[in-house]
Amino acid sequence: MGIEIQTKPFGKMQVSERQILSFPEGLLGFEEYKKFALIEEEEESVFKWLQSTEEVDLAFVVIPPSLFKKEYKPLIPEQELLGIGINEIKESLTLVIVTVPGEDPSMMTANTQGPILINKETLIGKQFISRNESHSVREKILESAAVEIG
């Protein structure tokens, strides 16, 4: 059975209950918003939307970091992972928030320092702070992908 939500990018739409994620602590800077829908833009698109079900104007573009950084390994203490019911990062769906500048989409960046990990079974997620010093709040996606490919 679907749930109707209002979204910033697509207007009103139906989502399944399995698309609704709980963030008991909210996201960094948006702690008051606890429920988000994970919405695919288009089947062939790598981008997804993390849309607040509580505030229509709150939506983030997200992607799996492995798409542009194959060896992405956030450094997060195991004790923190237990907070969402996982023991290892590989047990989660890992996403990073993308910022796309309107004037030049080729300069889009990803917050690899603040990964969002989601327990695939319980659909409970949290935005963590990676202790890996090579991770950045604004990692250039196309540059990182080019370095990995070339």
Curated annotation (Swiss-Prot):
Give the protein name, as stated in the record.
Flagellar assembly factor FliW
What InterPro entries does the entry give?
A: Flagellar_assembly_factor_FliW, Flagellar_assmbl_FliW_dom_sf
Q: Key word RNA-binding present in the record?
A: no
Which keywords fit this entry according to its UniProt record?
Bacterial flagellum biogenesis, Chaperone, Cytoplasm, Translation regulation
**One record GO biological process:** regulation of translation
- The question of whether Membrane is a record keyword is answered with no
Q: What does this protein do?
A: Acts as an anti-CsrA protein, binds CsrA and prevents it from repressing translation of its target genes, one of which is flagellin. Binds to flagellin and participates in the assembly of the flagellum.
| Homology family | Belongs to the FliW family.
Query: What Pfam families is this protein classified in?
Result: FliW
Q: How does it assemble?
A: Interacts with translational regulator CsrA and flagellin(s).
SUPFAM superfamilies linked to this entry: BH3618-like
